[in-house]
Amino acid sequence: MRAESRYTRVRGLLTHARVRGEGPPLVIVPGLGCASWMYARVARQLAPGRTVYAYDPPGHGLSAGRPGSPRTIEGLTNHLAAWLTEAGLGRVPLLGHSLGAEVIFDLAARHPGHVSAVIACAPTGIPENPSVRVQLGRLLLDLPRERPGLFLPALAAYTRSGPARMLRLAQNQSEHDTGPLLPHVRAPTLLLDGTHDPVIQAWTLEAICAAIPDATVREIPGGTHALTDSFPQTVARYTLDFLREAKA
């Protein structure tokens, strides 16, 4: 089942999504500096049951960007909301990875009409707001645990996004307080946690789960931070089972 690129003009920017599969839509929102092509493995596993949109934020992947933008998680969230409207997707489930999970929490709280369910895969930045230095140190610990085949696609994605954009967003993540928004997330929520992920602290998942009215946590034994790449079948199975139960 081949993927196709679709472009939608959003606020003057051509915004890209890699689309594959059949069935109701499911949107993947990438992590910091990541690109749609880094989620091909999990998209293939999800595609038999869903039409999967692997979304590229502005300045990421194949989406156009502007110098110095986006600067904030709020800006990422607002563009995602506008893209969902322009793409005609309506109210959909979203799977966010790493920083992308924080973006979809923001979206679910501030734009609830766009979100039918939340799947937060290795969510970062909540509620501890680690500094850029701490984030980088944890990612370096995670690097040797990841699948070697992810290295070149990730390098291409980070080169496309650029260090300046990534640094701005990482700095904003260390300041952005999503915690107070979590009780306003009314969509059913699944939190996915890899037991070998040094980037995420177990207590943060517990805090998120306690704050969101309808949330559950599933652990993936041996899972690294890039769960969608290292355990695509498990992530897809948990996601599809959850969406069936939630009727989303």
What positions do the PLM features span?
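Conserved HGGG/HGGXW glycine-rich cap/lid loop of the alpha/beta-hydrolase fold
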Residues: L13-L62
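Catalytic histidine-centered segment of alpha/beta-hydrolase-like enzymes
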Residues: G223-T234
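Short beta-strand/loop motif that positions the catalytic acidic residue
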Residues: H184-V185, L191-D193, D197
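Hydrophobic, aromatic-rich cap/lid helix
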Residues: F151-P180
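Active-site loop/oxyanion-hole signature of alpha/beta-hydrolase fold enzymes
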Residues: V10, R18, Y53-L95, R237
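Alpha/beta-hydrolase fold catalytic core
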Residues: M1-L26, A47-R50, L89-G90, R160, ...
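Acidic catalytic loop of the alpha/beta-hydrolase fold
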Residues: T195-I200, H225-A226
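Conserved hydrolase catalytic core segment
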Residues: G90-N129
